[in-house]
Amino acid sequence: MLKCICRVYSQPLAQMVTSPLFKHMGSAGTYTILPITNLRHLSTKNCPLKIKSNRSEPLQFGDFERQVPCSRKSGSSKNVQKRLYELRQLKTVLSETFGVTEYASFFESLRNALHINNCSENEKKKLLYDIILHQHELYPEVARKIGFYLPGEVHRWFWYHIPKSESFNHYLFLLKSDVLLFTSNYCTRFTNRLIKGTEMERQLATFQIFLHDETNIKFIMEKVLKLHTFDSLIALVNGLVKAKNFRFIKVFIQALLQKLEQHCYSGKDGAKQKNLRYVKFNNTLLYYLLKSGNVELFIKTFQEELKFIVSSGLLNHIDGNEHILNFPIHHYLNLLRISNRQEELFNVISCLQSSPLMKYKLFKEFLMGELIASFQAFRDPKLVCKYLLSSYSSKASANILNALGIWGWLYHSKSTTLTAPTLARELKNKNNILPNTMRIGSPVTVPILTELYRSLLSSSSVSLESGQFKNCLLDLYYKYKSFLSEEAHKYRYWRNDTGILNVFLNYIRFQAREPRLAYNVLLDFYSQPFAKKVVLTTTLCPFSIVAYKNHTLTQAELSELLQVMHKNGVPLTFKFCSAMVMHYVKMRDEKGARSWYNKILFGGFEIRHMALIQIIKDQGWPFPKNFDETLLTELVENNNIKEPTDSTLFTDEDMFEEDGKPRFNDDDVNKCTNIIRETLKSLN
């Protein structure tokens, strides 16, 4: 029998708890969380929505789950039933305060539940859920004000025993139970899993799923502030900015500011910690201004931040806090690159190459990423390769390039794999063009390889005849596939993502003009054993590249794509759903088109794609809640709105967005470069 809190009460138990709680504790069945709609079948089933006044109904916090009794398994032992009963009576005595004693009792009960034998995993999960639910109901003020901390071993058990398909429901349970989200790495893993999942899962992990109804915003943001730490909220907002998901960004930035002001800074390091947090907040603000294209405010914020870093004395504490300079300078370099100001970018890098910042590997990787990406403007893959070999471990990187077939096409203009002695001899003739301070030392990374593939294929599409270019594409693809199967596991930091695959599919579809070949390559790639470990790290889905306006595909082939996506856990994206809507509209299948549009509505995707907006208007379909109606005005005023051209559609992440280059004048550039120089002098 579990120990009870050492406190004596004379009144009956029923008078000491609320009626709903007493009824719940006395019921015969346990409770579980079930979704109203099976989200995992989103790709194969229609998702009907109630429509009102040409708007889809907003989803409320309570719409996502309901509590229903679950019958016990007939095979449960009497011992397990006894334990269930004991735990269901857990600490039913309401204490007047909630402190160390109550938390110790709560923890003890959770740990006792973990150690129960002869109990199925599902029953144990229900036990843990019951304990947490009871705690939440017994101490509503604690839940409302500060939330509940769970021991790390409980989160660990959840991670290893809750099926991946139940992650959505589990996370929703944690939110409703006011469980602090970032007190365990295992809880963070659930967050990351959801962020990489379906649109609904991403919106749950970022709380956006509850924000479509404006009446929820205040309550939900209070929960965000309570359950998140400052650092975890920074990570969440940065993720939204990276995806250019700006729907609720101002609300989240306000929450960050509140979190910044709430923290109590004390002790001898109090001032330093306060300044460090301010810089972290400012870096997130800079990132948002960069991604949203607000160049004028970015320049002002950047200059003020560097001045503050110097004046506050934070440069004296740079070790262990190198991010305070890494991120603002990286954002500025990124702005120079996307503005096609290569000369200014090279000038800043020349200032940085002898600075103390070069001792930080992450900063050097940032630097090389921007430098190599800037070379795309020159269409010179050999130049990209020279810098790659000068920065990363030349021997290991050359071996990777040789195995991938890149070395052969780059330096021999044909498909060939060199022997080790021949490769070593050729590598010896490649001069190092970077100072030692900029050397990273580890093998080349996947993002840098992605840039090299883009540069090589861009150049080859011009220099090679059509048939030769197609052979080049297929040779590089098959060697890449072979490398992932046989070689990639040898490299510790290798990360299987879809970046390189997207490059292949883009050039096969839009440069070689082989849409059916792109379909076959995609299916071939996802038929490989390594495919299940490939992570979607970008907003661009390879299935969208193949499906969008690909009129060579039959209905059966599109269905096969969906099956492959489901089998490999590839979530539906807005781009894929939009592609399917357009496909069915072209086929004059209104029912099929509406079915896919319902998925867009149910997923809570933001709609800004003008061609899709035209379809919605023509079909008389409802627009989503919080739809930006100025886009309708723009549609009326501009009768010549067209879909993006196929040749440029998939060259970057912004499949359905105008690619406007941010512009700023020479005076702004000079001011920013000069303040970087002054900051580096202070660092020295």
From Swiss-Prot:
Sample GO molecular function, one term: translation regulator activity
Transmembrane segments: none
Coiled-coil ranges per UniProt: none
GO BP term, example: positive regulation of mitochondrial translation
UniProt membrane topology term: Peripheral membrane protein
Cellular component terms per the entry's GO annotation: mitochondrial inner membrane
Name of the molecule in the record: Mitochondrial translation factor ATP22
Species, as recorded: Saccharomyces cerevisiae (strain ATCC 204508 / S288c) (Baker's yeast)
